[in-house]
Amino acid sequence: MSNNVVVLGSINVDTTYHVDRFPQPGETISAVSKSSAPGGKGANQAVAAARSGAKTAFIGAVGSDKEGAYMLESLADDHIDTRHIMTDELHGTGSAAITLDANGQNDIMVYGGANQAM
C-alpha cells in the first residue's frame, strides 16, 4: 500500500515575537527576541505528512519574492512535491506575525497575500 498525500492550503512565513507580556491598547512594548520559520496551516500539514513517510504533494501559492523562494526551498527540503505551487506576481507570500508571551499565550495576525489570491 502506498501513502500518497496531496495538501491544498496556505503557505506562510511565520515571524514570532517573544514578549514578557502583551501590550495594553495603544501601548508599545519591546520584544525579548524574534524568530522566523516556515508556516501556514497547509504547509505544516504537508511537512507532517512527508516526515511521517508519505509521498506528499502541495497545491498552493507564494509570491514572487524572497519569502516565496524560501518557502519553496523549505518544502522541497522536506521532499514535498512543489510543482503545483503557483508563483503570484501580484501578491506577496503569506505571512503571520505571532506574539508569544512568557506564559505561552499567543496572538496571531495573518497576511493572506498569494494564498487569498489563489
Please describe what each predicted stretch is.
Residues K55, D81, Q105:
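Residue-level detector of anion-binding/catalytic polar loops
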Residues S52, H91-G94:
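Short, basic and Ser/Thr-rich N-terminal targeting/leader segments
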Residues A37-N44, E89-G92, N115-M118:
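Short secondary-structure boundary/capping elements
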Residues S74-H91:
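A glycine-rich helix N-cap at a beta->alpha junction
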Residues M1-A61, K66-Y70, A76:
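Glycine-rich phosphate/adenosyl-contacting loop at the front of the ribokinase-like
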Residues H84-D88, I98-M118:
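Conserved phosphate-binding/catalytic loop of the ribokinase/pfkB sugar-kinase fold
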